[in-house]
């Protein structure tokens, strides 16, 4: 009896592999060109050396910065550090607007809500903590704790003031009702820690990147995985939607960033260099999508030409790993955060 079942399982695996091979073959037939070939005659970007400079240094954290996120007003940003503080900054004046003490200093992620009413954070406490910035209490206290993950919280992103998506080391993502503190949908299909999420511009989908070296596209309405993207050879640490919502970028421990197209269901470009041997911690796109910004373990932030796959600039200035970065929605600046306890705003 058991041998029959075992044989059926083996046959099912063979059938699945055969179908996958068929899908790959059909996809290759449709792939009549590559992005590199298509953009070969496109004029290169002008020299960027000295054009992008540090315009603001945000000093205030006393330990490694692990995460930052811009508000949609393009002025304020939130940062999370292992000094046990969540700081809300005015990026223009460099003033600290709020200093929120955390219950757990082992924080790994933070997020600003679209209305700028709330910020969220989480980490090794397995909890997503929500703070109301409109609260009259000082210091601001946690107003909601979302507690269902069985592993560390690696990333969180608001859809609106009432809903937030979290990813975790328990290999799942969860969509939460912030008001009630309850779980709406659990997304489970990864075979490794989920490290990063990025929500689509229309708020109907999100991308996740994980330690199983895959990125997955999820439908927030059905709760199902719609597409799986492979190609990386190590953990995916960062994912970010392309501005038009039809593609997304990834950064991995295999020392490469990649661009995947959702409609073509395939990888479009790799961003690598012989001199780059370290992992990528974070990725972001310029307003137009022509630049891909990537933070690296070697203390640098590299700027890539998205269409041609060439490195156009390397931003140096941090004294330790660049752990996070972000571009505001108006695309007017780039903020990098580092283990050197500093945030830098470039423009």
UniProtKB/Swiss-Prot annotation:
The keyword Membrane applies. One of its GO terms (cellular component) is cytosol. It is found in: Cytoplasm; Cell membrane. InterPro entries: G-protein_beta_WD-40_rep (IPR020472), Gprotein_B (IPR001632), Guanine_nucleotide-bd_bsu (IPR016346), WD40/YVTN_repeat-like_dom_sf (IPR015943), WD40_repeat_CS (IPR019775), WD40_repeat_dom_sf (IPR036322), WD40_rpt (IPR001680). PROSITE patterns: WD_REPEATS_1, WD_REPEATS_2, WD_REPEATS_REGION. WD repeats lie at residues 60-90, 102-132, 148-177, 189-219, 231-261, 275-305, 317-347. GO terms for molecular function: enzyme activator activity; G-protein alpha-subunit binding; G-protein gamma-subunit binding; protein kinase regulator activity; signaling receptor complex adaptor activity. Keywords: Cell membrane, Chemotaxis, Cytoplasm, Membrane, Repeat, Sensory transduction, Transducer, WD repeat. One of its GO terms (biological process) is G protein-coupled receptor signaling pathway. It holds the Pfam family WD40_Gbeta. Guanine nucleotide-binding proteins (G proteins) are involved as a modulator or transducer in various transmembrane signaling systems. The beta and gamma chains are required for the GTPase activity, for replacement of GDP by GTP, and for G protein-effector interaction. Required for normal chemotaxis in response to cAMP and for aggregation during scorocarp development. Belongs to the WD repeat G protein beta family. G proteins are composed of 3 units, alpha, beta and gamma. Interacts with gpgA, and this requires phlp1. This is Guanine nucleotide-binding protein subunit beta.
């Amino acid at each position: 009896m058991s041998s029959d079942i075992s044989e059926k399982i083996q046959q099912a695996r063979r059938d699945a592999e055969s179908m996958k091979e068929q899908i790959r073959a059909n996809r290759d037939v449709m792939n009549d060109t590559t992005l590199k070939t298509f953009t070969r005659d496109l004029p290169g970007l002008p020299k960027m050396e000295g054009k992008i400079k540090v315009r603001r240094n945000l000093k205030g954290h006393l330990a490694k910065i692990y995460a930052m996120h811009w508000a949609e007003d393009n002025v304020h940003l939130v940062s999370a550090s292992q000094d046990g503080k969540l700081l809300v900054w005015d990026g223009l004046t460099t003033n600290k607007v709020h200093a929120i003490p955390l219950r757990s200093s082992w924080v790994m992620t933070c997020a600003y809500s679209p209305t700028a009413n709330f910020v969220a954070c989480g980490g090794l406490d397995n909890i997503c903590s929500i703070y109301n910035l409109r609260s009259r209490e000082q210091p601001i206290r946690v107003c909601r704790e979302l507690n269902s993950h069985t592993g560390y919280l690696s990333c969180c992103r608001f859809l609106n003031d009432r809903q937030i998506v979290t990813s975790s080391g328990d290999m799942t993502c969860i969509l939460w009702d912030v008001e009630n503190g309850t779980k709406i949908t659990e997304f489970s299909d990864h075979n490794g820690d989920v490290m990063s999420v990025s929500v689509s511009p229309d708020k109907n989908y999100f991308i996740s990147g994980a330690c199983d070296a895959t990125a997955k596209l999820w439908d927030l309405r059905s709760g199902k995985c719609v597409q799986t993207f492979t190609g990386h050879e190590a953990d995916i640490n960062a994912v970010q939607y392309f501005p038009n919502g039809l593609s997304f970028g990834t950064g991995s421990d295999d020392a490469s960033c990649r661009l995947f197209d959702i409609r073509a269901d395939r990888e479009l470009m790799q961003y690598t260099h012989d001199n780059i041997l370290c992992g990528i911690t974070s990725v972001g796109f310029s307003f137009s999508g022509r630049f891909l910004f990537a933070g690296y373990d070697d203390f640098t932030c590299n700027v890539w030409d998205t269409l041609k796959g060439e490195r156009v600039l390397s931003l140096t200035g941090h004294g330790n790993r660049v752990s996070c970065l972000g571009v505001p929605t108006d695309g007017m600046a780039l903020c990098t955060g580092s283990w050197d306890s500093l945030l830098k705003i470039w423009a």
